[in-house]
Structure formats: C-alpha cells, structure tokens
C-alpha cells in the first residue's frame, strides 16, 4: 500500500513540478524582453537628450558609476544628459544579456558611441516596484582599444 501511495504521489507531483518550472521560465523570458525593450528606449532617449525616460526609469535612490569612476545620483545623471556630458549621438549595444532573479534583473553588455570612450562594458540592476521596472544601479567601464 505504501508503495502504491508513493508511486501515485510521484505520478501526480512530477507533472505539476514540470509545469511550474515551465511557467517560471516563461515569466523570466517575458521579463527579459521587457528589460531589453527598456534598454533600447533608454539608449534612444539619451541620444536625443530626452530626460523623460531617465526621470521615469531611474529609481529615486539610483546610484551609478560612470566610465571615469564618478558616482552619480538620479539628478546628477539627468543633469548630465541635459548638458550632453553623459551621452551624445547614436550608440549601439552589443553582447547583451539579461538575467532575472525574481523582482530583480541584471543587464550586461557593451555600448559603443559613449562620449569620451570607444567602447564601454556596462552592468545595470533593475528592481520591479509597483509592477514597473526601475533602474537602481549601473556601472560603466571603458574598454581600452574598443575590445
């Protein structure tokens, strides 16, 4: 009887576990797509010095480190966009990866076309708050020789 109960339990539980993993994977890929889309919009808005996206996307407690190692708050970042010191013109992102950890996302890749640097490796951290992704931290490192 015990054996029958164990086999029955496993027969019922295994498909449920597999379904749960598939649903979680779908949720992660949807979140990855959301972050990729936000990052595309982010680059476009910075290229045109449009601060609307930064005001909406950056968390109020945002802290970033730019390619020169300076720490920047949300307001300092927005001021830099307006002044044209953070970003100027068209940029291209490559080797992009997004990893989802529940309500946190980590985005990495390269961006070319950043003012004062040929190529920058970046990492950005997002947290989902009130059903909306917010960038809470970022860091850019200049890659010598554009490699």
Annotate each language-model stretch with its function.
Residues 4-7, 21-147:
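A beta-strand edge to alpha-helix "cap/lid" segment located at domain peripheries
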Residues 7-16:
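Bacterial N-terminal signal peptides
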